[in-house]
Amino acid sequence: MDTKKKRRVVITGLGTVNPTGNTVAESWANIKAGRCAVGPITAFDTADFKVKLAAEVKDFDPAARIDKREARKMARFTQFAVAAADEAVRDSGLALEEIDHTRFGVILSSGIGGLPTIEEEHTRGQQRGFEKVSPYFVPMSIGNMAAGQFAIRFGLQGMCSCPTTACAGGTNAIGDAFHRIRDGYEDRMLCGGSESCISPLGVGGFASMKALCTADDPARASIPFDARRSGFVMGEGSGVLLLEELEAAKARGAKIYAEVVGYGANCDAYHFTAPAPGGAGGAACMRLALADGGVVPEQIGYINAHGTSTHLNDSCETTAIKTVFGGHAYKLAVSSTKSMTGHLLGGAGGVEGVFTALALHDAFLPATVNLQEPDPELHLDYIPNHGRAAQVEYAMSDSLGFGGHNACVVFKRWEG
């Protein structure tokens, strides 16, 4: 592909609600400080559960950020997403009344959608009859509704889509939005992901797969790349990026966080939950992203890894990095911010995209916290326990999902 003829795409707005903070400023300050947001589950009684910990969003009042009447019609994952989108649009300084709304689109992922709403309405149906469930039940619970609410809220008439590629979805959303602008279909896109399924059925389902950590100590639960890692910790929240065609952004004097330069997406075609042996699919995806952006492996200085704290993921992802980067794998920095946020599933790529853009913009690489016992079989620079000031030119964000979905986005530092 001849990337010289393609339009350039930059990030001009960021928004998030996640376990480390309900705004970008709050979250990034806590990420830089290495504060882990994992704690006891409060969303429901865990007395009969082996899993006791999650990374919950705290002190989120939807009525403070969304019209109360509208918030009542939204599931929690949509409330998070709308709040994050509002922040991203405000942050961008974009005057919505002055742009062509047919050239502004949305791609927002959710892996599971309104699962707690489904549980609540099922209980109500059993108690009162299923024809007496909420009339908002269906639009609240379907996964595409957060994307639809963005479009309705801001009057966006470009493409509006919802990738449901599990834990790769948020990164797929960013990459697909990047391509839509680069290839001339839209001039601006809101993109990212959102998830909220810390509920009895959500936790129970992943626990029955033996995918979740059952530790009691929050500091020894989400521990990517640690020798004692034993499963992921469920998180919740949303991350939204506003992408814009470079010349349009420059024409209005927009603040630019970073440039998006490459995107890769593929499938392992191996197993419905396990990654391909040796991380072959992930490695191929990284190569696709590098080639798409015309970037060579030695130019990458930081990778925000998928890093779920499961034995298979962390091992396969590390092997994939070594395969793609060779000797340079030992020179670049790799970290998993899931050590602080937990795993946001379909929302993970959006939040981690926000963090990767900020890492480039602020010249600060976040840590993998609580990494106390490094796995001797992995041995890369995982930025253990303390983030560091470092200016890198290119960074990569990886996401891998059930079904064999792989997604990777390459970002470039903006020099003005």
Which residues does each PLM region occupy?
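Glycine-/small-residue-rich "gating" segment that lines the acyl/pantetheine channel
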Residues: 127-134, 175, 179, 188, ...
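Phosphate/pyrophosphate-binding loops at sites that engage ATP/ADP/AMP, CoA/4′-phosphopantetheine
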Residues: 45, 88-100, 248-256, 286-302, ...
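Conserved small-residue
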Residues: 13, 31, 85, 106, ...
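ACP-dependent fatty acid/polyketide chain-elongation machinery
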Residues: 1-70, 247-259, 355-368, 412-416
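Active-site-adjacent elements of ketosynthase-type condensing enzymes
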Residues: 47-56, 113-117, 196-222, 264-284, ...
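Active-site-proximal alpha-helical scaffold in enzymes
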Residues: 81-94, 143-146, 151-154, 159-195, ...
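Conserved beta-ketoacyl condensing-enzyme motif
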Residues: 11, 24, 32-165, 194-203, ...
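Condensing-enzyme catalytic core mediating Claisen C-C bond formation in acyl metabolism
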Residues: 8-12, 36-39, 217-293, 301-302, ...
